Structures are given as C-alpha cells and as structure tokens.
Amino acid sequence: MQTKYQYGIYIGRFQPFHLGHLRTLNLALEKAEQVIIILGSHRVAADTRNPWRSPERMAMIEACLSPQILKRVHFLTVRDWLYSDNLWLAAVQQQVLKITGGSNSVVVLGHRKDASSYYLNLFPQWDYLETGHYPDFSSTAIRGAYFEGKEGDYLDKVPPAIADYLQTFQKSERYIALCDEYQFLQAYKQAWATAPYAPTFITTDAVVVQAGHVLMVRRQAKPGLGLIALPGGFIKQNETLVEGMLRELKEETRLKVPLPVLRGSIVDSHVFDAPGRSLRGRTITHAYFIQLPGGELPAVKGGDDAQKAWWMSLADLYAQEEQIYEDHFQIIQHFVSKV
C-alpha cells in the first residue's frame, strides 16, 4: 500500500455528516492529494432515513471545510441500486473516472461496521484503508434524537456548522412532516414488539404500463404520505398473491379494465426483497408487470389508500424520481427495461 495517493474516495450517505465522518475525511486528506466524496442514495424521496437531498448534504459538508480544503475536494452522487451491485458499481466507476482519468493511485477509505458495509469489498482495483470505528458517532442515533427533539443527545456529535444547519432545518415543513412520520414508525414497530418473532410483511404491487405510461397513485397514508407510488398493499390471508394484487389495483385506481383482461395481461413478475427497502420493517413485495395494448389510456380514479390515481409518462417518472416511494422507481425500472 502506498503512503500517499493521488485520490482518496469516501462513500457515504452522510445523513447527517457528523464528527466521525469529519475524522475520516481529515484522514483522507492526509493520505491523498485530492478526495472524492460520493454521496449515496441520490434522488431518493425524503424520509426519516434520508431526510436531506444531495445538494443539501453537499452544502452541509462544504460548510465544515475551509476554502483551501474545498479546492482539494470533489463531490459525486450515485443512486441506489438495491437489486444490482453491478449497476451501482458501474455508476461509481463512471463517475470516478471523470475525475481520476484512470489513475491507479487511488485509495478507498471506510470502516466495515456491519453487513451494510459490504460495498467496501467491491473495488479490487483500488487500495483500501480501514479507518477504524468511532462508536460515539452514529447517524442513525443522531437522526433518532433529532426527530425526538433531544438536542443534548446529538448537538455535540456534529460539527458546529452542521448543528446550525439542523437547528435551521427544524423550522421547515419537511422536518415537521418527518417528525410525524418518525412517531408513526415508532408506534408501528412498538405494536409488533411483543410478537414472538420479528414480523415479515408480504405485499403486492402492480406495474401497469400502456403506451409509455405507468399507472401511479399518490399515497394518503403514512409512511410516505403524499409520495408517488405503485398501486399495491398488504396481502390478505384468504387470497393468492395475484388476487391480492388485482384487488389493491382496483381499490386504489378504479382502473376501467375488466379483471379477466388484467389477469391475462400479466407478462412478468418478480420478488423485491431488499432487507432495508421499507422503514416499516422487513417487507417483501411481489410485483406484477401488466402490459396493456396501445390505445386510449383507460379511465382511473384514486380510491382507498390513494389520494389520486393517474397515468404518468415514463419521462415524468424520471423527472419526479425524488417523489417516488421506497424502491418503487427501481421496481418500475426492472420491468420497463425489458420491453
């Protein structure tokens, strides 16, 4: 391993950027002439796990650094690819290549704290530097204290510039909405706390596509109140997966297509089971791809758990990625990329 590198790479979500992150960044600046900070979870919808968007996180980190240091720091963003490490890796490699020009003098810095750190093993072409564990600093714990209003439990865990940002953000409508969602999720999990085993929830989702449009709804229930989602929901004990999917589809969209036609138009299905895909807990969804023939889009109307139902063009879908619930954007991508 070299003692000095041309580039250091530091990957994280930084939700929020805390003193442990700052220590690692300072180490990267010692070991490398330039540091590339890669912000993960780019363009995901704001929730209690990812409250801040990429430009906000970038601004938070920049506020902690001097103008001289900032000249040595590059920021990149990368989307989540929960179901394809290769696509995530390709995105990281393409972004990094734009800055490094293919240099071999590159080191990745990080700490293998748990299963979520497995990505650190995916870069054999670059050296790896273990930064060590900072047990006093956890973004998860900081967010929890933040949404519970316990300033004494987190203000000393973040740089002063971040503390100022967090206090200002508390005045925003997003913070108020996220606090409400945080309390909902805590109560939701508490309701299952006495179960003999940790629950695993089974849901279904319908990906209905016609003529370059996908059928979407706007949620009117927490979590994800107001976000754009696929029609779907929990399976009932007395129905099959397909029956549950079709029931939820009809309840939430009032789609004017007969059930036999919908059932006959199912062309694909897939299980989406990323362990962290839902903040409610372990939730596995069975998604069904329904391809309707071209022509006039059938009438729809929101119902049940949906404020609204409408046909969204695929172009609008990509433009509004930051408003799409959980991993539903990736579910849609999985199916439409095949046709």
From Swiss-Prot:
Instruction: For the motif Nudix box, give the residue ranges.
Output: 233-254
| Cystine connections | none
| CDD domains linked | NMNAT_Nudix, NUDIX_NadM_like
The Swiss-Prot or TrEMBL record annotates one GO molecular function as: ATP binding
Compartment(s) where it occurs, according to its Swiss-Prot or TrEMBL record: Cytoplasm
Which positions fall inside the Nudix hydrolase domain? Answer: 199-335
What's this protein's function? The Nudix hydrolase domain is active on ADP-ribose, (2')-phospho-ADP-ribose, IDP-ribose and NADPH.
Name listed for the protein in its UniProt record: Bifunctional NMN adenylyltransferase/Nudix hydrolase
